[in-house]
């Protein structure tokens, strides 16, 4: 296909435009008349198509030059597709098997063709439906640890890390969205904000809490300045597809170099929002068991993260940070240094979790966990619990010492009625 001028794909044009790509034809066959093409994208930014035949299946994702959720009044650079591709390449190396296999990439057309994940289901859909996912915590905890460690100055050669950091600074439009929608706009009456009727008293509490807003902005300072590792940038339950045997992480177009705790914090917040939304999705006879399982997933994810991070610390610490020449080679333990790093990561996880819990209820793009609750009175009550716990996490990110304290806090807030 020509790559001279960008043109959005359609169901009608996709086969002709991609039909000459050998790597695609190897999977779905040369006979384009037998390709079944459907548009399946339900996200905020991109076109997504499935291409199926008797031979095989693929996913084709194309960036649009604007935010699909809003329209062409909010332009976005097509280069985000390039950064998504680059993140996927690095994640595939740092945690093999954790992301979809890339079949084809066209930078000018902003197209990525990938393996179709079957019979995988979006994690958020499973959480809303009350489905249990075996091995979820282990797989995602290890993913966060491996990508955080192996993308950092603990592991990479400093020249490679610095050049990669410089390249990803070009993803500034997507970083700008995070800086605005996540860290800033929930805390004032921004133009595109919206929230459920009945939440006004809670919103007033949050937006008048100067100490909390300062803590949120301090986390934004870290987001903009601390290029610790290559982050997925948007690791929510809609960015994970899974079966009981396999978990794949998708959609890293918000990739950037930032705090090591960013991805784990985003993921944790999404588990907490799933937890607080459950009373609207479950019958009373299954509610407690499923909510407890979600909290167990949070605890086990963090345990898996710490265990894997410690393992990599001992086996792959070859970068400029905390070198063995300063510790083990002199007969000194590096355990104190490791614990300091993990404590630093944990504080960021807690703060980011609270901020994202606010963003997903007050800013532009909300979570289906709450949005699919048709009873707005019920929804606002559950969202209020979520918002008030988010406030607690932001304010106390340095005093909540471990994940057990966090999950116990969730149990407490789950019993409160703030409206």
Predicted regions and their residues:
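ATP-dependent phospho-/nucleotidyl transfer catalytic cores
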Residues: 121-232, 243
């Amino acid at each position: 296909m020509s790559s001279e001028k960008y043109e959005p794909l359609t169901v009608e044009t996709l086969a002709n435009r991609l039909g000459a790509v050998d790597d695609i034809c190897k999977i779905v066959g040369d006979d384009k008349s037998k390709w079944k093409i459907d548009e399946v994208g339900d996200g905020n930014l991109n076109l997504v198509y499935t291409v199926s035949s008797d031979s095989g299946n693929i996913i084709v994702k194309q960036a649009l030059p604007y935010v699909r959720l809003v329209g062409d009044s909010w332009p976005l650079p097509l280069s985000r597709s390039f950064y998504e591709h680059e993140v996927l390449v690095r994640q595939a190396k740092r945690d093999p098997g954790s992301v979809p296999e890339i079949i084809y990439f066209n930078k000018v057309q902003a197209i990525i063709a990938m393996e179709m994940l079957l019979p995988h289901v979006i994690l958020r859909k499973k959480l809303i439906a009350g489905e249990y996912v075996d091995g979820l915590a282990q797989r995602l905890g290890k993913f966060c640890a491996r990508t955080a460690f192996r993308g950092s100055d603990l592991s990479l050669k400093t020249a490679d890390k610095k050049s990669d950091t410089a390249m990803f600074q070009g993803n500034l439009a997507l970083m700008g969205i995070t800086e605005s929608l996540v860290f800033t706009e929930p805390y004032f009456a921004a133009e595109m904000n919206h929230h459920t009727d009945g939440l006004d008293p809670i919103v007033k509490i949050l937006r008048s809490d100067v100490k909390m807003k300062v803590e949120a902005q301090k986390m934004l300072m870290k987001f903009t300045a601390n290029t610790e590792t290559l982050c997925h940038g948007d690791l929510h339950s809609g960015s994970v597809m899974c079966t009981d045997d396999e978990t794949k992480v998708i959609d890293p177009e918000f990739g950037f170099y930032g705090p090591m705790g960013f991805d784990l914090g985003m993921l944790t917040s999404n588990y907490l929002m799933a937890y607080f939304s459950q009373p609207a999705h479950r019958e009373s006879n299954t509610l407690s068991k499923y909510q407890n399982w979600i909290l167990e997933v949070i605890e086990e994810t963090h345990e898996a993260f710490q265990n894997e991070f410690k393992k990599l610390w001992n086996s792959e610490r070859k970068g400029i940070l905390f070198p063995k020449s300063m510790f083990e080679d002199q007969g000194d333990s590096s355990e104190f240094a490791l614990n300091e790093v993990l404590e630093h990561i944990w504080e960021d996880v807690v703060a980011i979790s609270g901020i994202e819990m606010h963003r997903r209820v007050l800013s532009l793009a909300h979570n289906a966990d709450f949005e699919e609750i048709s009873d707005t009175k019920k929804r606002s009550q559950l969202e209020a619990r979520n918002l008030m716990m988010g406030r607690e996490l932001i304010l106390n990110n340095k005093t909540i010492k471990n994940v057990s304290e966090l999950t116990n806090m969730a149990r407490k807030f789950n019993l409160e009625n703030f409206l």
